[in-house]
Regions:
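Cytosolic juxtamembrane N-terminal segments of multi-pass membrane proteins
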Residues: 1-33
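N-terminal topogenic membrane-targeting module
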Residues: 14, 19-21, 95-103
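Alpha-helical transmembrane spans
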Residues: 22-97
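Structural detector for short beta-strands of small beta-barrel domains
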Residues: 96-117, 150
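Short aromatic-glycine-enriched beta-strand elements
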Residues: 114-126
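Short acidic, S/G/P-rich loop/turn micro-motifs used as interaction or catalytic elements
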Residues: 114-116, 132, 140
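Short, structured beta-strand/loop micro-motifs enriched in basic residues and often containing a Trp
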Residues: 126-135
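A membrane-cytosol interface segment of integral membrane proteins
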Residues: 135-164
Length: 164
């Protein structure tokens, strides 16, 4: 049994592409919600600081320079956080959709596990990308440890698509 990593890219099938597009829509919706919350806080927190300063008896709680400096810093932090969040989440998914490729990796079964709690069957793999996959009853009993299995996942986002 060879332990070399064998993988290649193939084009996405139509149903896989539709699945990824729906997943991208859901992730973008969450991303934009998070973005709006950060932008809202970037403008509200300086006002809250001004109100707090006024409640302490400060005769001139609002100074435009300080207000815009704090707002600018918060906007910069929010912008950086949302950019990193996009690059790590929806950005990778968008890359996979636009390039329309998936990776097929040839790996071997290192261990078979039955989970009686939820009546599922799993193969643990020798793959650096997937630790385990859920399989059906037939494949679980047909294949044995050391057998070769091919797994499919998106190239950049590493979203599991199936096995054969």
């Amino acid at each position: 049994m060879s332990q070399y990593l064998i993988r290649h890219n193939e084009p996405l099938e139509e149903d896989e592409l539709v699945f990824l597009q729906k997943k991208e829509q859901r992730e973008l919706k969450q991303y934009y919600r998070f973005f709006r919350i950060l932008m809202f806080l970037s403008f509200i927190l300086p006002f809250a600081g001004t109100w707090y300063s006024a409640s302490d008896g400060n005769p001139d709680p609002f100074t435009p320079g300080k207000f815009f400096a704090v707002t600018g810093i918060l906007l910069s932090i929010s912008g950086f956080v949302t950019w990193v969040g996009y690059r790590r989440g929806p950005g990778k998914l968008h890359y996979d959709i636009t390039h329309r490729t998936k990776t097929i990796e040839q790996t071997h079964i290192s261990r078979k596990v039955y989970m009686p709690q939820n009546n599922t069957y799993h193969f643990y793999l020798n793959s650096p990308n997937m630790l385990s996959i859920e399989v059906n009853n037939t494949d679980y009993h047909r294949m044995k440890e050391g057998d070769e299995v091919n797994i499919e996942y998106t190239t950049k986002a590493k979203i599991y698509l199936g096995y054969f």
